[in-house]
Structure formats: structure tokens, C-alpha cells
């Protein structure tokens, strides 16, 4: 099972979402920023590293707000751990994605998210975690 961390990064009531490029697995799907936990790495450390690599920010990682296990039809499975991020240093910059944007949580279902993120997308759209 692949272990992944992702951030719910908030700014003025909006949440940061990212669109994969055409060349990534599951191309053009939307997701929350983050990535794989490397061998021997703690989840919060992995998320700090990923946010620095992908967005150029030094994030203050808050509480774990959700943990989701998902199995794709291909048989691949993933455990996603989502953490709240309300504070960070630096300006958010798009280093690897096709597009990034700040979305109103109620609008999240309009975007074509990764299947593993859909439960959380519905919760966020319903006002959870705001």
C-alpha cells in the first residue's frame, strides 16, 4: 500500500487545489498538494518536504483531519493522510502542476478530483473543517 500525505492549505476561507499535468499518472485530475512518504520518514516531515518541493513554502503542519484508504480498480491501494495547514512562510508558487488555484470549499465538487479524494471533497463542500 502506498502511503501518501496531503495538505488542506487555507487562505481567507479558500483552499488550495492543484491540477496534475498531462504527463502524470491520472492526468489532469485535481488533488490537494502533497506526496509519498519515503522510507523512514514521518508523515508531517514528508508533507513539509513535499510542500517545499511543489509550492516553495515552509508550512506549519497542523492536525491530521482525515485518513482515507482507497483501492483503485487496478488493484493499487493508497492510504491518504490529510493535514490542516493554516500558516506558512513564503509565497505559494506553482513548481510542478498544470494549474493551482484557491477554491471556495462549496465549489470543490465542480472539479475532477482523484477518486481517492472524493469523500474529503464532499466533506469540505459540506462545511466540514472550515
Regions found by a protein language model. Give the residues of each.
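Conserved N-terminal beta-strand and adjoining loop/helix that marks the start
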Residues: 1-16, 36
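Generic C-terminal helix-cap and adjacent flexible tail
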Residues: 125-130
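Residue-level signal for inorganic ion chemistry
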Residues: 7, 32, 104
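Conserved Nudix-box catalytic region and its N-terminal flanking loop in Nudix hydrolases
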Residues: 14-53
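Active-site-adjacent beta-strand/loop module that shapes the phosphate/pyrophosphate-binding cleft
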Residues: 58-59, 66-92, 99-102
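Conserved hydrophobic "DFG−1" position in protein kinase catalytic cores
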Residues: 9-10, 17, 87, 102
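NUDIX/MutT-family hydrolases
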Residues: 82-84, 93-124
Amino acid at each position: 500500500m502506498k502511503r501518501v500525505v496531503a495538505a488542506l492549505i487555507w487562505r481567507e476561507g479558500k483552499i488550495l487545489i492543484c491540477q496534475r499535468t498531462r504527463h502524470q499518472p491520472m492526468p489532469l485530475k485535481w488533488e490537494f498538494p502533497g506526496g509519498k512518504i519515503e522510507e523512514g520518514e514521518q508523515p508531517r516531515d514528508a508533507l513539509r518536504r513535499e510542500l517545499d518541493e511543489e509550492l516553495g513554502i515552509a508550512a506549519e503542519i497542523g492536525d491530521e483531519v482525515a485518513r482515507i484508504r482507497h483501492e483503485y480498480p487496478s488493484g493499487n491501494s493508497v492510504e491518504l493522510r490529510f493535514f490542516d495547514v493554516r500558516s506558512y512562510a513564503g509565497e505559494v508558487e506553482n513548481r510542478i502542476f498544470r494549474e493551482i488555484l484557491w477554491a471556495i470549499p462549496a465549489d470543490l465538487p465542480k472539479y475532477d478530483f482523484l477518486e481517492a479524494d472524493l469523500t474529503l471533497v464532499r466533506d469540505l463542500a459540506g462545511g466540514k473543517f472550515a
